[in-house]
A protein has these predicted regions:
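Segments of small-molecule ligand-sensing domains
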Residues: 313-323, 334-389
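Extracytoplasmic "Venus flytrap"
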Residues: 53-74, 96-103, 124-127, 190-198, ...
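Extracellular/periplasmic bilobed ligand-binding domains
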Residues: 201-293
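Extracellular/periplasmic periplasmic-binding protein-like sensory domains
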Residues: 256-327, 382, 386-389
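An alpha-beta-alpha
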Residues: 58, 160-223, 242, 333
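Hydrophobic alpha-helical segments within soluble ligand-binding/sensing domains
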Residues: 105, 163-186, 198-199, 226-229, ...
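Beta-alpha junction/loop-to-helix N-cap segments that form part of ligand/metal-binding clefts
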Residues: 64-69, 85-155, 222-228, 249-251
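Periplasmic-binding protein-like
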Residues: 112-124, 144-146, 188-191, 239-249, ...
Length: 390
């Protein structure tokens, strides 16, 4: 009896130990389940926000333009969120730096895709945007391009991308109209060999020849070049009435200075990539009287005064050339999501195709090729260190 009782007591002790261990395990599992439930609720709340990617050059020579694009898009998103967001959801922006470099653009684009963005806006340099079209197209992500406008983008579009800026052929038409108005019969065309500037140079040369003009010289330089003396010599000896520079402001300003220093008296016309205060600073007095084919900037838009003032107040700097259009695109993507009545990307793409959006820069309607229906380019001239309408 005594031996049996002792064994029984030992068995009871083991059971108690097992029960304690079991309760501890159960408590841990309950704690984990509670934590996972909380995480799931947090994830669901985060998922309710609509993530919009902004891709722009945040570093490099064109970082100022990229910063303007990001700032203006965020201003538009803030305004939408202040009114309750879209379909009850807030928009959360996330920015990727493409540095206007094709390789970095691919990295930036892949990053946005991996983050699960609903849509993407931005794109300043055509050469950087071009290799990302397949990435966004394969992922089925709506992409509204703000600045880049090479016709090569139209050919590579998989149907999900939309060009909110007028295309290169529209700019070429505006350029030829200006050449004819100013009586230029022979022009020299200079580009940097990238997708944007080479496309604009080619389209303009073809359009000018079709209009009866002559291409006196066609030169290609390298981005970052400092000495344009060889190009200047060729331009002067060609007998050109005017020079059309189709690349960006850094090279355009140096070429302008060196042309004037060499005694070139003809006209100088710049593509839209030169609409920057930095061009005027670098070119100095040599820039006086130079023409620019400008996108719709805040200084040229009668209804943009409030936006211009708020931008300056918010960021402590003047709104750049593409700030108005960037702000419009921020509003446009919110409008498309609202009309799609969901964050479904196919529905958003269809909503973008049917856009009739009125923004600061004018009306945004797309053709069946997802390009802007009407040209937004206008010639301006440098006077007193500023770009002014004629």
């Amino acid at each position: 009896m005594h031996f049996g009782h002792a064994a029984w007591m030992r068995q009871q002790g083991k059971w108690r130990e097992l029960m304690v261990v079991s309760f501890k395990r159960l408590a841990k599992r309950l704690a984990c389940a509670t934590a996972l439930a909380g995480l799931a609720m947090t994830t669901m709340a985060a998922a309710a926000d609509i993530k919009i990617g902004i891709v722009a050059p945040m570093t490099g020579q064109l970082a100022s333009e990229g910063q303007d694009m990001e700032n203006a898009v965020k201003m538009a998103i803030d305004a939408v969120n202040a009114k309750g967001g879209v379909n009850g959801d807030k928009i959360t922006p996330t920015t990727a730096d493409d540095a206007c470099d094709p390789q970095q653009a691919v990295t930036a684009g892949s990053k946005l895709v991996s983050e699960g963005v609903t849509a993407i806006v931005g794109g300043y340099c055509s050469g950087a945007v071009l290799p990302t079209l397949k990435i966004y197209g394969d992922a089925g992500i709506p992409f509204v391009i703000i600045g880049a406008n090479s016709t090569k983008l139209v050919a590579a579009n998989q149907g999900n991308a939309f060009l909110a800026n007028s295309t290169g052929d529209m700019q070429a038409t505006t350029a030829v109209e200006l050449f004819k108005k100013n009586g230029y019969k022979k022009i020299a065309v200079v580009d940097e060999g990238d997708a944007y500037s080479s496309d604009l140079a080619k389209l303009t040369a073809e359009a000018f020849k079709s209009a009866g003009g002559e291409i006196a010289a066609k030169e290609t330089t390298t981005a970052g070049e400092q000495d344009y003396s060889a190009v200047v010599t060729k331009i002067k000896s060609s007998g050109a009435d005017a020079v059309f520079w189709t690349a960006y402001h850094a090279g355009g300003a140096l070429l302008t200075k060196q042309l004037r220093q060499a005694g070139f008296q003809g006209g100088i016309v710049l593509g839209d990539g030169n609409n920057s205060p930095e061009y005027l600073e670098i070119a100095g007095s040599a820039g006086e009287g130079v023409y620019l084919l400008s996108p719709p900037t805040v200084d040229l838009l009668s209804g943009a005064a409030d936006f211009k003032a708020k931008y300056k107040e918010t960021y402590g700097r003047d709104a750049g050339a593409y700030a108005a259009l960037s702000h419009d695109v921020g509003g446009l993507i919110a409008d498309a999501i609202t009309r799609a009545k969901s964050a479904d990307q196919k529905a958003i793409i269809e909503a973008l195709k049917a856009s009739d959006f009125k923004g600061l820069a004018g009306e945004i309607k797309f053709t069946d090729k997802n390009t802007l229906q009407t040209s937004n380019f206008r010639p301006v001239i440098a006077k007193g260190g500023k770009w002014v309408a004629e």
